[in-house]
Amino acid sequence: MNVLTYNVHLWEGRDGRMDIERLATIIEHSQADIVALNEVLHPVETHFGVSRPLAELANLLRMDWAFGESNRVVQMAGWWGPVGNAVLSRHPILDDTNHYLARLPMTQGRNLLTARIAVEPERTFTIFSTHLDHAFEGTRLWQLRGVLAPLRDYAAEPHLLLGDFNTHGPTGPNSQRLTPPVVRVLRNNGYVDAYMAAGEGEPGTFPLLWPFRIDYIFVPQILQPQLQSCCVLTGKLIEQASDHRPLMATFAWN
């Protein structure tokens, strides 16, 4: 089972265009079964009316979808709308829940989207998709409390926490970069950084030039034996589609 996390930059590519077919091609080629998306606008308003790029993307990929807004509206060049996180799945999404995260006055709203997926008739898999504050580690730690609270109910069940955590992580086992507090807290709560456990290739996801690690897939210890690999996807199309590169982890599911 392939699980992907991808910040789609409010649907704007580096060429300034909203190209949903381009994103669909990237995800289709990745062979992802489940996708967590950050910086998703849904629905989108333009001077010509309302569109739903998230639903269009899901239709192109023949996937179920869920969306949770972050209580924030973003204005782009030519389009605008509520921003949040989304989940796409080749398997049926049974239900979804949106959790608003703490924020300081005059800062951006953030949220955690929970999607429970029926990967088999009698087995479910839960995805938690989030995007933490971009400015301060202290705010991210505060928001992380709101992330961990619902996760505790799933401690004994298969689940993943993934998304854009906006915290610069170590780049490999021999990295001299200190483990940031957000990652330490998650580790102390029983979560494994998928790239540090099974990473292959260069780990940076943002920005495209000289990238850092800010996008993560966190795996509970009960699921770690199934983790097979984790890598950042690259390619010409990916370099044009967003200001982030997608991160994918592969699990044995039996």
What are these regions (language model features)?
Residues 1-4, 81-85, 89-94, 107-129, ...:
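Beta-strand-turn-beta hairpins that frame and shape the catalytic cleft
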Residues 7-8, 40, 132, 164-165, ...:
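Active-site metal-binding loops of divalent metal-dependent hydrolases
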Residues 10-14, 42-43, 98-104, 130-138, ...:
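Surface-exposed cleft-lining segments at the edges of enzyme active sites
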Residues 16, 46-51, 63-87, 167-241:
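Active site of divalent-metal-dependent phosphoester/diester hydrolases
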Residues 33-34, 125, 158-160, 193, ...:
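Short, Asp-centered acidic motifs that coordinate Mg2+ and/or phosphate
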Residues 162, 242-254:
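Surface polyanion/phosphate-binding segment centered on an Asp-His-Pro turn
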